[in-house]
Amino acid sequence: MINAAQNVLSDENNQIGLIYRAQSPYQMAWREWSDIPTVDKRNGVFSDYGVLELIDELKDSKVIINNSNYYIEPTRAFVAIDVNTGGDMSFAAGLKANLAMAKDLPRQLRLRGLGGQVVIDPAPMSRQNRKTLENAIKSSLRRDTIETNFVGWTSMGLIELQRARIRPNWLTL
């Protein structure tokens, strides 16, 4: 095939023509795309690439980020998220934990297939930092592929989100 193409290119009259016609699109695809990517068919590929560990992490409601963690608990009415700072109870640690959660939250909700009303109980922080956290959450939600609206703050200091339900919760499958 390559020799035929080189002969056509070296032709002096430079007329455009058909080199070889395929009998079907299937045969043409095999001829044109003969470099087949290798497929790993070994047993245990999921464990080799860490997929099983990621699935185990999704089964647990606890998500560990930096020196803090947060819990994602789906209920019948809404998805509850509780952010914790660990041992450090300072407002700075609370803000740091909340910002880390804001960055990771869309990914966790997407992987778990969670949607509907989402209520976040942020770690303790000063009222002046609410706008910072709100902007961080909105920024990370804008980068997500699933439509999520920041509804606002409740009088109790909780954050409300409304997220589109794209697929069922993966734990119910």
Task: Describe the role of every protein-language-model region.
Residues 65-173:
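Conserved glycine-centered short motifs in functionally critical loops
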Residues 1-77:
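Extended, charged alpha/beta regions that create polyanion-binding interfaces
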